């Protein structure tokens, strides 16, 4: 018998099985093909706004995605650097082939983990509890817990034009019985849709008609364990390119709108709001004269370019016209045509904050089956599901992150409390406390928590403590370093637009000012540190007031989260509650007053009434 069985070896499944096996649980992962472990069927990249911070959080919790992303990156780019640190995010262009190889090897080397190459027919449920899985050949594998991370493979159809083909992503097979076994147990499913653009042969593109988009020329990384020698040097990194749709492109799309699976009535599932198809963009943003597209390399082993922003479900002949209307792609050869894919997802309102099903005990779900989109969102969920399944086996308290602790916490709270009717994507705007949830401080927020439950090694924890001590010492030294007015200092301040010093002050006081850095003051203080130490001191000092306010605001949330609501509260008979509140509270059954307050349709007077019932 296994402690944990994971169904599906995509980005959620990988982190789930690695988390549970690192916590010394006997784990198995079932995949249709070992060669598809960690595949990237859509964009060949990791990170981006909000999502890049999730990858940093996965690193702080001992996950594998950040390590794999660093070591297989073709380009590193820090985004939003003209804005405040609360929205800085790293994005890497990934080598999708190298990434798959890295992840497959990581799973094969992991202790306490078996890889089973098979199709999973159903989750086996007895007396309301998941007790294992049945494979397509009718083999039963018993397990104390099951984690479903089947991605877009449940009853999936690939759609182009007026044609629907029973298939999973990248011409892989689909499984039609798995979601039925869930529905039979009372779990609600619904249809979602996503899509992917065409891939074209690199050597048939005229890149002189495109704008080069190089990466960031500095050492960047997702994982704190990555060293400079582990990543591709800047001069060897690939360059992406920017182009725009043309009037001819729009004309072709408008002419053939009725041929798109999206608009012909073939698609029943709801598509992603924040990553729409190109035909959807033209309909929704009719006033825009052009849309930007990025030409992105997929792998050093492939001669293909991914056209980011150009997903479509048009027929193949129309796709030929569309692609050839783009600048630089007039004579290109299409290697793989775009498609939309429709699949079954489960209603996340039936999931507890620890990712266990409310309907079937010992069944955990993570990734796109929960209604999310994106590799990073999936990986973050997978890690949490794997950890919580392991904790459930041990009879320990669940591991749940608050909204002020992690973007992963924001995502899971949104899913459990608000649900979703469309593919959910993390955005910085979803986080009320984004100044606390920064790229730079993920380890400070989460690493100790990961260490306490067995996700993070002693070696990694010791390195973290050493780093925190170095930051503390550096702050003290800079606070004690007195800078007196003199001509050199005055000249430095003047070059940055400041008046000369009227009297002496500490280096830390000067660092509060914009543009003044630890390195810039080094010749006056004799103090300089590693780049990440300098960055921490500068962010903590320059944004101290804003960070303090965010922490005060978060305290209110923390107090609300401590106020527990009994699972068996009879909301239907609380006459003072509004009708909508009674219905939604009965369905969602929030665990805390804080969670109840975030349910749409619950008003302050309802919360006041509930506060009297807090146990």
Enumerate the language-model features and the residues they cover.
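Conserved N-terminal/central alpha/beta ligand/cofactor-binding core
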Residues: 18-122, 149-166, 173, 177-178, ...
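An anion/pyrophosphate-binding glycine-rich loop and adjacent beta-alpha core
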Residues: 33-35, 180-320, 417-503, 512
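Glycine-/small-residue-rich beta->alpha transition segments that form the dinucleotide
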Residues: 145, 150-154, 314, 327
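Extended, charge-enriched "interface" segments that sit outside catalytic cores
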Residues: 430, 447-452, 456-608, 612-614
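A glycine-rich dinucleotide-binding beta-alpha-beta segment and adjacent secondary-structure elements
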Residues: 306-372, 400-413, 531-584, 589
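Beta1/beta-strand and adjacent pyrophosphate-binding region of the FAD-binding site
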Residues: 1-12
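Internal hydrophobic alpha-helix adjacent to the cofactor/substrate pocket in enzyme cavities
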Residues: 378-399
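Core beta-strand elements of the Rossmann-like FAD/NAD(P) dinucleotide-binding domain
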Residues: 136-145
